[in-house]
Amino acid sequence: LQGFNDEVLDLDHETFARECAIDVPGPETDALGALARQWDAFVMGQAKARHPEFPGRFFNVGFVLSPEGEVILRHHKVVPLLPVEHSVTPHNVWDRWIELYGRNLDAFYPVADTEIGRLGFLMANEGSYPENARGLAMNGAEVVYRGPYPHPHVGNGLFEVQNRARALDNNFYLIACNVGTYYLHTDSDVPIDTFGGGSAVIDYRGQIVGRHDYSAGSSWVAGTIDIEALRKFRASAQWDNWIKDLTTEQYQLIYEQPIYPKNLYLDRAPYTHAEYRREVIDRQIELMHERDVWRRPDKG
C-alpha cells in the first residue's frame, strides 16, 4: 500500500515504522474491507505494518480480507528484497518469533481455509526461493498470491519462469500481481515504472490461464480458478502430483548447516544498503566459498 520509497531512498527504519507503517487491522484495511463487503469478494493485499511485540520495527505483511470485511489472515514476509528492503522478517527475530508463535508451518507459512479455497502468500522475493512455495503447499495452500517483482527480472522472463515453476512444483494456483506506475515523492509530477507488468493467473500444472504483459499504468488480469479440478488432480494423478513422493529424510541433509544468520535484527534496526553489503552480502559470499559450495572465480 505504501509503495517502495523506504527501499529506493534507503530511509531510516525506525522513522518509517513510526510515520509510514500502518496497523493491520486498521483504517486502511477497514477501507478495503468496505470494498470487500460491497462486492462480496475476498481481497488480498500487502503493506508495511507494525507489530505490537516489536516496537520501532515494521514488517511487510500480506493480509486476506473476507467478504465480511474482516482480516482473516496475516502473513509476515519471510524474505525481503535483499539487499534494499528494510522490512524485518520472522527469521530476523527468530528466537522471539518462535517464542510467540511456535516452530511450525503456521508461524511462517499461514494459510486461510475459505469457501473459495485455501489462500496463502508468496510475496515478491519470497518467490525467488522454492522453499517458501513448498512451505505453503505443505501447509495446504491452493491459491497463492505472488506479490510484485521488479525489473530487470520481469523483462528478461525470470518472473514468469519463477511463477510457473512454483505453481507446477506444488500443484497450486498462483496469482502473480505486479504493480503499475507510482510516484516516488509526494511532489513528483511524473510517475515511474520499475516493475514492468507480467501479471498472470497460473494453474496447478504451470499453465498460464490469464496474463497482462504491460500497460504503463494500473490495469487488471483475470482467469478461471477451478479448485475442484485442482483437488481432483492432486487426488488422482499418478506422477505429477509431486509432493506425495518427497523423500524428506534425504532432503533434510541439504539444510543441516545454517547459512543465513538468524536473529539479525533481534537487538538492532535493519542495516542501511551500504551496511548490509558489508556486514551480510560479502560475508555470505565468502561463506559459500569457504564451504566449497561455490568455486572462486579466477583473479584478473
Question: What are these model-derived regions, one by one?
Answer:
Residues 1-20, 146:
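Short, conserved active-site loops that position catalytic residues or coordinate cofactors/metal ions
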Residues 2-3, 63, 74-81, 200, ...:
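Short beta->alpha transition motifs characteristic of CBS
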Residues 11, 87-89, 186-189:
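Short helix-coil transition/hinge motifs at the ends and kinks of transmembrane helices
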Residues 19-21, 68-71, 88-90, 98-101, ...:
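Glycine-rich loops and low-complexity Gly/Arg-rich segments
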Residues 20-44, 118, 124-222:
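CN hydrolase (nitrilase-like) catalytic-core segments centered on the catalytic cysteine
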Residues 21-22, 30, 34, 51-142, ...:
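Active-site catalytic loop in hydrolytic enzyme cores
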Residues 47-48:
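Recurrent small/Gly-Pro-centered beta-turn motifs in extracellular repeat architectures
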Residues 178-300:
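C-terminal beta-strand edge segments of enzyme domains
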